[in-house]
């Protein structure tokens, strides 16, 4: 007869009517019993012949997560003009005095961040935007291009102009300006001015003056630079070696490399094409010629280039006869002025050699499960985390549940701050640009690659045999709808583009590490600046705690102003005030301890509701289930040990079958959650020790001993001794000399014993006692006569590696008398 749930509970000693612990508990360590129970609950039977189940509720295998849904009305989020101040260390020092070594080191790591992988694989531009939504190809293409354009405008991306130069928007950092141009370094004379050396044409300098308000010194600079070494270099290295499908960047930046013999008449239309702010009457009158001007490479490049230069694909439709009712020329003729073929940033810098390729693909998804109106860009740089050349990312400490509870479980009022676009605060060195490239090959190649009726001839370097091969009803309808959204930007977005990251991207394993270092350093500074405040962060989640609500509000204002002065952007709409129970990292933390948040409890209920019994479940789905159950395991009676059968099946990559008893056992475990309480410091007065044959306890002046029926492995014996000490004395601080018991990981013990011990020792704190000093050592060896003196061993709760204690300075004595006695200013308060 299979083991019933009631019997199983009694076996695990979870019921009160169990016999004496000293007899019952050692039985659970018996290998035979564990094997029989495993067979009864069908836990050991890993080889099954029935087909596996691949979906349980919302859980599918790890590698086939739910299919994202495309939303044609996604809004591209706006990005504030994020510019983290370069002298952030000085600013903090002005605010709080000298920084500690740790804070300084962490802030130096991100000013600027560096990324140098050993090996980078370059992919063709066609792979730039992933065809993630086959039904909505064109729509997804333009939405993604618009998102990338928004990031570039916000100063988060560089735009590759030529192999060695890039342009960007926003405020430059010093490491972006001091880059070497040719043989000499070119320092910008006045900030905010285009660092592109003007070519000697009066017309051009006029344009630049009017657009950028150049100071007089810049004119002198222009004359000085005409015979620069790098305009000579440009003539030596042809800029013409371009991969197919990428148009020459001749329209703007490359003009500077043109040899001085290039006539003014050649340069002015190019300038006009590049900057629509200049009057465009001439361009409108002869739209056909504008195209030709537009793509003329500099004369130097043209002389050495054998390849034909292709005119702008989009504008070519203007002069061609419509091929049908759905010809793209109808759309192109909607507007006279489609604007420039390319845009250029406010600043140009020199970069290491960057090929016209991408290193990762991008696509859009919902911003988060609760916000499907806005999109989020997913960047896939997974090439750096796999294969032979994978980068092993730095590890960093994340506080475990007990440390977090020790730290944050208190009677404080809490609020959490939301850092907007946290990753995009941290600047990357331009030298990382060649490794982090995204982009697209332009609409023509994107559509051609994916549509069936058009053919690409590679020997023609990506030209189409016939311009109208593209025209199709689907494309026409999509573009017409998109025209209502994007207007003349359709032209700009249909061109190829290559962008590199200027701030750290989310798809690289280095980014979470850098973000964690950055926010923890900032919180450390805040804690020292405001001694009565507890500031803590995990990634971009920053929480502030204070003794009273009034104090918290004034702190909030002061801390917000401090963060804004460093250039950190907060999202005021998302500031949450939690009262006395803080919601953080998926937990609710209050003075009583911590519990999982409601949405996780809801997920647990759903999971058990849909969990099939007696059906083999694919081990990948088990991974998902264990992920959820593992998060809440510390709040259950038996903890992680209860999940060991599941872990075992995942490790052996076998299907797992839930028996009704095991499911009922887990269900009861997870429907009654117990808070994890804060550990309190105290003195240890109860000690336990064991040998393979016997155990001994020392409680105050009392000594006890006992023997096991059969010799046991030493770790098992030590665990049993600790359980006896806890049940006999009721003390929640125990001394032991066994490191495994000390670690409170009971997953390596016999399964039943691990489950029972977890419940008996729940909420117990352990102190390490060296064997030589352990008062329970003698009784465990059967010697009761000798009494070693009891040690005075203090227990201090740990906050893990989250070093926090900035000791509060004493409060000045001349405070006015009417300060309320509960005011945090009156008592120098230290974190719990």
Curated annotation (Swiss-Prot):
Annotated region described as Spacer, given as residue ranges:
178-335
Site keyed Priming of reverse-transcription by covalently linking the first nucleotide of the (-)DNA: positions: 63
- Matching InterPro entries, A to Z? DNA/RNA_pol_sf, DNApol_viral_C, DNApol_viral_N, HBV_DPOL, Rev_trsase/Diguanyl_cyclase, RT_dom, Viral_Replic_Matur_Polypro
Coiled-coil blocks: none
Give the residues the record marks as binding Mg(2+). Answer: 418, 540-541
Q: Which SUPFAM superfamilies match?
A: DNA/RNA polymerases
* Domain of life of the source: Viruses
Q: Where is this region: Polymerase/reverse transcriptase domain (RT)?
A: 336-679
Domain remark text: Terminal protein domain (TP) is hepadnavirus-specific. Spacer domain is highly variable and separates the TP and RT domains. Polymerase/reverse-transcriptase domain (RT) and ribonuclease H domain (RH) are similar to retrovirus reverse transcriptase/RNase H. The polymerase/reverse transcriptase (RT) and ribonuclease H (RH) domains are structured in five subdomains: finger, palm, thumb, connection and RNase H. Within the palm subdomain, the 'primer grip' region is thought to be involved in the positioning of the primer terminus for accommodating the incoming nucleotide. The RH domain stabilizes the association of RT with primer-template.
The similarity comment for this entry is:
Belongs to the hepadnaviridae P protein family.
This one is known as: Protein P
* Organism listed in the record: Hepatitis B virus genotype D subtype ayw (isolate Japan/JYW796/1988)
Source gene?
Answer: P
């Amino acid at each position: 007869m299979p083991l019933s749930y009631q019997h199983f509970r009694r076996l695990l000693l979870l019921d009160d009517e169990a016999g004496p612990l000293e007899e019952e508990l050692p039985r659970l360590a018996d290998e035979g019993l564990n094997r029989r129970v495993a067979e009864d609950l069908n836990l050991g039977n890993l080889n099954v012949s029935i087909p596996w189940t691949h979906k349980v509720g919302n859980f599918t295998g790890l590698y086939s997560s739910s299919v994202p849904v495309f939303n044609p009305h996604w809004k591209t989020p706006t990005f504030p003009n994020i510019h983290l101040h370069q002298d952030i260390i000085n600013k903090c020092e002005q605010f709080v005095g000298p920084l500690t070594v740790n804070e300084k080191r962490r802030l130096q790591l991100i000013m600027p961040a560096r990324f140098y992988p050993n090996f980078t694989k370059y992919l063709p531009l066609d792979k730039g935007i992933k065809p993630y939504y086959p039904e909505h190809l064109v729509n997804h293409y333009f939405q993604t291009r618009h998102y990338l354009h928004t990031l570039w405008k916000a100063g988060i991306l560089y735009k590759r102009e030529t192999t060695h130069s890039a342009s960007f928007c926003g405020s430059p950092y010093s490491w972006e300006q001091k880059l070497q141009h040719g043989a000499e370094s070119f320092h910008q004379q006045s900030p905010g001015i285009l660092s592109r050396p003007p070519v000697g044409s009066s017309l051009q300098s006029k344009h630049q003056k009017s657009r950028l308000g150049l100071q007089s010194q810049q004119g002198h600079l222009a004359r000085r630079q005409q015979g620069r070494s790098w305009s000579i270099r440009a003539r030596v290295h042809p800029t013409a070696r371009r991969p197919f499908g990428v148009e020459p960047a001749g329209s703007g930046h490359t003009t500077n490399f043109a040899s001085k013999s290039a006539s003014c008449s050649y340069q002015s239309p190019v300038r006009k094409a590049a900057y629509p702010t200049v009057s465009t009457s001439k361009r409108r009158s002869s739209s056909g010629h504008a195209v030709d001007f537009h793509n003329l490479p500099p004369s130097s490049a043209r002389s050495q280039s054998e390849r034909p230069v292709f005119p702008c694909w989009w504008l070519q439709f203007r002069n061609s006869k419509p091929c049908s009712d759905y010809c793209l020329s109808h759309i192109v003729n909607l507007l006279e002025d489609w604007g420039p073929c390319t845009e250029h940033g406010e600043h140009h810098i020199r970069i290491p050699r960057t090929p016209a390729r991408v290193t990762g693909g991008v696509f859009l998804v919902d911003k988060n499960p609760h916000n499907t109106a806005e999109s989020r860009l997913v960047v896939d740089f997974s090439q750096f985390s796999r294969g032979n050349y994978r980068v092993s990312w730095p590890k960093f400490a994340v506080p475990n549940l007990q440390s977090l509870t020790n730290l944050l479980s208190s009677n404080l009022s809490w609020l959490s701050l939301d850092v907007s676009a946290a990753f995009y605060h941290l600047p990357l060195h331009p030298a990382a640009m060649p490794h982090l490239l995204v982009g697209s090959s332009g609409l023509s190649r994107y559509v051609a690659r994916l549509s069936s009726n058009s053919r690409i001839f590679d020997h023609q370097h990506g030209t189409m045999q016939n311009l109208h091969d593209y025209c199709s009803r689907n494309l026409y309808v999509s573009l017409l709808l998109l025209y209502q959204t994007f207007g003349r930007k359709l032209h700009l977005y249909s061109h190829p583009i290559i962008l590199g990251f200027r701030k750290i991207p989310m798809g690289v394993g280095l980014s979470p590490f850098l973000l964690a270092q950055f926010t923890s350093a900032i919180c450390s500074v805040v804690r020292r600046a405001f001694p009565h405040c507890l500031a803590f962060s995990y990634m971009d989640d920053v929480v502030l705690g204070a003794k009273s609500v009034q104090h918290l509000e004034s702190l909030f204002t002061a801390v917000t102003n401090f963060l804004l002065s460093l250039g950190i952007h907060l999202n005021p709409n998302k500031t949450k005030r939690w009262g006395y129970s803080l919601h953080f990292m998926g937990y609710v933390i209050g003075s009583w301890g911590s519990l999982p948040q409601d949405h996780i409890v809801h997920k647990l209920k759903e999971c058990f509701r849909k969990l099939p019994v007696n059906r083999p479940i694919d081990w990948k789905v088990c991974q998902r289930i264990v992920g959820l159950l593992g998060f809440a395991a510390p709040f259950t009676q038996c903890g992680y040990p209860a999940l060991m059968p599941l872990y075992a099946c995942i490790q052996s990559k076998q299907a797992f079958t839930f028996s009704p008893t095991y499911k009922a056992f887990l269900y009861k475990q997870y429907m009654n959650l117990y808070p994890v309480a804060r550990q309190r410091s105290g003195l240890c007065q109860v000690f336990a020790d064991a040998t393979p044959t016997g155990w001994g306890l020392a409680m105050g002046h009392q000594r006890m001993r006992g023997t096991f029926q059969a010799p046991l492995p030493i770790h098992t014996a030590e665990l049993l001794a600790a359980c006896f000490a806890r049940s006999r004395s009721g003390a929640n601080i125990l001394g032991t000399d066994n490191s495994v018991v000390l670690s409170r990981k009971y997953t390596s013990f016999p399964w039943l014993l691990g489950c029972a011990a977890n419940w008996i020792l729940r909420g117990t704190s352990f102190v390490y006692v060296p064997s030589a000093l352990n008062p329970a050592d003698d009784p465990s060896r059967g010697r009761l006569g000798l009494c070693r003196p009891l040690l005075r061993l203090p227990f201090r709760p740990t906050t893990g590696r989250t070093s926090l204690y900035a000791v509060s300075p004493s409060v000045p004595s001349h405070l006015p008398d009417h300060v309320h006695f509960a005011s945090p200013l009156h008592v120098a308060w230290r974190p719990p």
